């Protein structure tokens, strides 16, 4: 029997049909079209982290592209992990975020900068990353972001998301017209109850729109 609250990880290629269906049930709490969104994310990721209850129900899951990208910027070596679709019902996803970072850090050589990044249009996702990692989370929402974070986000949007900046006035953290899967009305209403100040709101990103914000956390081994 699986211990309630235990974080597990499975390669995407080894997911059973039954487990995928249970992931779909969780995603349906958020999205109007959970099947297409889940299929797209599973094609992009290579690992799924999840917490499964004793009765087999999935309390939360996170699809991850573990070794997403590598590059050298200003003589520093960077490795990127992409945090894809994450949904939670009966379990907090925060411990899963922390487990991904722990596993990722064990693969990094000394001096490597690890970057865990995602794109989002909901303040709850940003808040979850804040709770999981505490510091070195970008964008900060301040008027002036650190130069290194600007360099990293420009690389992420151009090399990974293939959306280069059109002008110097563009916000490098803001991706235009990228999201396909709409939230369901219940989730839109829930997001509307969020009380807090995040860069998502400051950038004018709406949960019922298609713009998203690049969010990332950096750390050095």
What do the predicted segments below correspond to?
Residues 48, 58, 99, 103, ...:
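A generic structural signal for ordered secondary structure
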Residues 81-83, 101, 217:
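Polar/charged side chains located within well-ordered beta-strands of beta-rich proteins
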Residues 71, 104-112:
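Alpha-helix termini
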Residues 88-106:
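Conserved acetyl-CoA-binding loop-helix of GNAT-fold acetyltransferases
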Residues 21-29, 38, 54-62, 91-95, ...:
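Short linear motifs at secondary-structure transitions and domain/linker junctions
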Residues 1-15, 39-45, 109-221:
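Terminal substrate-recognition subdomain of acyl/acetyltransferases
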Residues 7-87:
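A conserved beta-strand-loop-helix scaffold within acyl/acetyltransferase catalytic domains
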């Amino acid at each position: 029997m699986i211990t309630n609250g235990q974080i597990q990880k499975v390669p995407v290629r080894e997911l059973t049909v039954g487990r995928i269906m249970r992931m779909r049930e969780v995603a349906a709490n958020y999205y109007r079209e959970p099947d297409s969104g889940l299929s797209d994310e599973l094609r992009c990721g290579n690992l799924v982290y999840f917490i499964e209850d004793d009765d087999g129900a999935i309390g939360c899951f996170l699809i991850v592209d573990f070794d997403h990208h590598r590059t050298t910027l200003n003589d520093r070596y960077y490795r990127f992990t992409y945090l894809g679709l994450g949904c939670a019902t009966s379990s907090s996803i925060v411990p899963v975020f922390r487990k991904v970072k722990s596993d990722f850090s064990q693969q990094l050589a000394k001096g490597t900068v690890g970057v865990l990044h995602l794109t989002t249009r909901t303040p709850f996702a940003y808040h979850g990353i804040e709770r999981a990692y505490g510091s070195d989370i970008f964008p900060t929402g301040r008027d002036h972001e650190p130069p290194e974070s600007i360099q990293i986000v420009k690389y992420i949007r151009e090399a990974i998301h293939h959306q280069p900046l059109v002008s110097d006035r563009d916000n490098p953290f803001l991706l235009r017209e990228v999201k396909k899967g709409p939230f369901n009305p219940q989730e839109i209403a829930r997001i509307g109850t969020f009380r807090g100040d995040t860069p998502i709101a400051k950038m004018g990103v709406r949960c019922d729109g298609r713009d998203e914000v690049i969010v990332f956390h950096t750390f050095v081994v």
